[in-house]
Amino acid sequence: MAVTYEKTFEIEIINELSASVYNRVLNYVLNHELDTKNTRLLEVNLLNQLEVAQEVDLFQQPFEELQAIHEYWRSMNQYSKQILNKEKVA
């Protein structure tokens, strides 16, 4: 599978966004001293889901799939902001 400039650029954007989202949730979990083994906690489940999603080998994906993955991370970015902000307000 050929790697093009556009594909490499898309992968770099996804990597930056996914790291930002994952780190936001991880920092929340650590700062609130949540038990990472307690799968009944929404934040812990979200952290685990994001960790699994980061393990995808992006270089093995076709460009169209990269676009879908990018949209997934955009959605998780919005979702994590909403969830973590609601927790701060409550």
Swiss-Prot record:
Coiled coil: none annotated. The keyword ATP-binding does not apply. The keyword Chaperone does not apply. Pfam families: Epsilon_antitox (PF08998). InterPro entries: Antitoxin_epsilon/PezA_dom_sf (IPR035569), Epsilon_PezA_dom (IPR015090). GO terms for molecular function: toxic substance binding. Keywords: Plasmid, Toxin-antitoxin system. GO terms for biological process: negative regulation of cell killing; response to toxic substance. SUPFAM superfamilies: Plasmid maintenance system epsilon/zeta, antidote epsilon subunit. In the presence of the zeta toxin, forms an inactive PezA(2)PezT(2) heterotetramer. Belongs to the epsilon antitoxin family. Antitoxin component of a type II toxin-antitoxin (TA) system. Neutralizes the toxic effect of zeta toxin. Part of a postsegregational killing (PSK) system involved in the killing of plasmid-free cells. Continuous synthesis of the epsilon antitoxin is required to counteract the zeta toxin. This is Antitoxin epsilon 1. It comes from Enterococcus faecalis (Streptococcus faecalis). The lineage of its organism: Bacteria, Bacillati, Bacillota, Bacilli, Lactobacillales.
